[in-house]
Structure formats: structure tokens, C-alpha cells
Regions:
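Class I S-adenosyl-L-methionine
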Residues: 1-15, 20-114, 122
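A general structural motif
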Residues: 66-69, 138-145
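Short, acidic/small-residue loops that bind anionic groups at enzyme active sites
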Residues: 102-127, 132-142
Length: 145
């Protein structure tokens, strides 16, 4: 079986900001894995009867985020040897585990990343027009700062 992972960006927390494409992908997933269950979309999908797991236990096992991200990606690619995987994260564009998925991607494997509303998008939308840094904003994950 060709390894296949689809990454879904969950967004800043409001389930209504989730894209229809991402929601449908998660509902149809045979193997849905959340980076963390500490996201409102996890609760909404669980209440709707969608089966999933999370990688929350990694946070207790690791002190080094780089090592944690490497091992998350390794575990996801291993799981993808048996099932197509949907991996749900806050923001695929800034997530360290997603960066590692790209770095570790086997030659014949498929890695698909679905876009979503970012935390920065949600914050900027709340700013008054004269303060919104349209085109002049650079986001850096705290772990990289």
C-alpha cells in the first residue's frame, strides 16, 4: 500500500472556521489522528461519533520539541503503511510535526496538506483597520523564536 497522509489545518478554535473540505476529509477518514485532543474541533467530532485518536501522550514523554516532532512524524509514516492517515493540527503551515512529515516523506508516499484559517488570520480580523498589518506580517512559531 502506498503511504498516504493528509494534513488538515483545524484553525484557531472556532469549529465554524473549519473549511468544508477539512471537515469532510476528517469525517470520511479511516484513521484520524489529532496532534492534540485539546482543540474544540476534537470535541465536536467526537460528539458526532467520528472515531479518532490524539498524540497528546507525546507531550508527557518529551522535553525536546524537535525530538517530539521527529517521532510524531515517524509514527505517522509508520501508521500510513497500514492505513491512509488524516492528521489534524492547529496550523499546517507552522506545525513542527508537519515540517518533519515533509522531511521524512518516503519517495513513493503522498503527503497532502489542506489549507485552513490560521491563528494569525483570526487575530488580524479582530484588529481595527488602521492597525491591520496587511502584507506586512511575519509569523514565527514560538519554538523557533
Amino acid at each position: 500500500m502506498k503511504q498516504n497522509i493528509t494534513v488538515v489545518s483545524l484553525g484557531p478554535g472556532d469549529p465554524e472556521l473549519l473549511t468544508a473540505q477539512s471537515l469532510n476529509t476528517m469525517k470520511k477518514a479511516k484513521r484520524l489522528i489529532f496532534r492534540t485532543a485539546q482543540h474544540p474541533v476534537y470535541a465536536v467530532l467526537t460528539e458526532a461519533g467520528v472515531q479518532s485518536t490524539s498524540l497528546d501522550d507525546y507531550y508527557d514523554r518529551y522535553e525536546d520539541f524537535d525530538e517530539m516532532h521527529r517521532d510524531m512524524a515517524k509514527a505517522l509514516w509508520t501508521e500510513a503503511e497500514h492505513h491512509a492517515v488524516v492528521f489534524a493540527v492547529l496550523d499546517a503551515g507552522t506545525d513542527g510535526a508537519v515540517r518533519e512529515l515533509r522531511a521524512q516523506q518516503p519517495q513513493d508516499a503522498v503527503l497532502r496538506i489542506l489549507p485552513g484559517v490560521t491563528l494569525a488570520d483570526a487575530c488580524i480580523a479582530q484588529l481595527p483597520g488602521n492597525l491591520a498589518p496587511i502584507g506586512a506580517l511575519r509569523t514565527i512559531p514560538a519554538e523557533d523564536a
